[in-house]
């Protein structure tokens, strides 16, 4: 599939790391799956995805891209997000770190193909 240049990139990116106890894994995945399905339909959500670390067990990284800071703020106060936050607070987290990046500019690039 050929990549095309995006017409508008995110103004805000959120990246969060969750290191959870193995016993909470399935519940965590169910929570996140539901939250992602709801959030992807919200105004301004450009993407929202989860990736599992392939080396460290039960370590996950969430990333979100938002068109505007206002869209993200509306998400933060929404009932579905608040419900997810409350449910996550019941988990045993070994670590949780989140960063919000304000994007001032971006440049599209096609990554080079392998040199074979």
What feature does the model see in each segment?
Residues 7, 34-46, 65-99:
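An amphipathic, aromatic/His-enriched active-site/gating alpha helix that lines ligand/cofactor pockets
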Residues 2, 36-61:
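Short, glycine- and small/hydrophobic-rich beta-strand elements in well-ordered beta-sheets
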């Amino acid at each position: 599939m050929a990549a095309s240049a995006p017409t508008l990139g995110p103004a805000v990116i959120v990246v969060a790391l969750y290191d959870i106890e193995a016993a909470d894994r399935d519940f965590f995945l169910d929570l996140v799956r539901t939250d992602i399905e709801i959030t992807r339909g919200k105004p301004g959500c450009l993407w929202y995805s989860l990736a599992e670390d392939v080396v460290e067990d039960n370590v996950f990284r969430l990333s979100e891209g938002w068109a505007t800071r206002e869209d993200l703020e509306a998400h933060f106060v929404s009932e579905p997000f608040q419900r997810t936050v409350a449910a996550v607070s019941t988990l045993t987290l070994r670590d949780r770190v989140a960063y919000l990046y304000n994007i001032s500019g971006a440049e599209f690039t096609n990554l080079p193909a392998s040199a074979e």
